Curated annotation (Swiss-Prot):
Belongs to the universal ribosomal protein uL14 family. One of its GO terms (biological process) is translation. It comes from the Bacteria. The keyword Ribonucleoprotein applies. Keywords: Ribonucleoprotein, Ribosomal protein, RNA-binding, rRNA-binding. InterPro entries: Ribosomal_uL14, Ribosomal_uL14_bac-type, Ribosomal_uL14_CS, Ribosomal_uL14_sf. GO terms for molecular function: large ribosomal subunit rRNA binding; structural constituent of ribosome. One of its GO terms (cellular component) is cytosolic large ribosomal subunit. This is Large ribosomal subunit protein uL14.
């Protein structure tokens, strides 16, 4: 569960290392985001020669949460931390590589590119 002011690590090669959630998109009163949800983030920590700079605002999709995801068969998929992948205005990933596993819940029409780039899909 990601909410406003949550810190996330970045799971792609855009150069951003850490981002801060500034808004959960999808309704005026929406408070929490889970895996597959789109959020607005501010880059808080970035590599020196990366594609993104500190302080820039981007959309991002949540790919891993420490809270976990309940599946239909009753299983629960949890991760050690929260992670997101940065998106451009067309909701396409900015980076060309994805680090770490992603969940099957991302396999929608919007995020098939992220699933295909990921080294492991749980």
């Amino acid at each position: 569960m990601i909410q406003t002011e949550s810190r996330l690590e970045v799971a792609d090669n855009t150069g951003a290392k850490s981002v801060l959630c500034i808004k959960v998109l999808g309704g005026s009163k929406r408070r929490y985001a889970s895996v597959g949800d789109i959020i607005k983030v501010s880059v808080k920590e970035a590599a020196p020669r990366g594609r993104v700079k500190k302080g820039e605002i981007y959309s991002a999709v949540v790919v891993r949460t420490a809270k976990g995801i309940r599946r239909g068969d009753g299983s629960l998929v949890k991760f050690d931390g929260n992670a997101a992948v940065l998106l451009n205005a067309k909701l396409e990933p900015i980076g060309t590589r994805i680090f770490g596993p992603v969940t099957r819940e991302l396999r929608t029409e919007k995020f098939m590119k992220i699933v295909s780039l990921a080294p492991e899909v749980l």
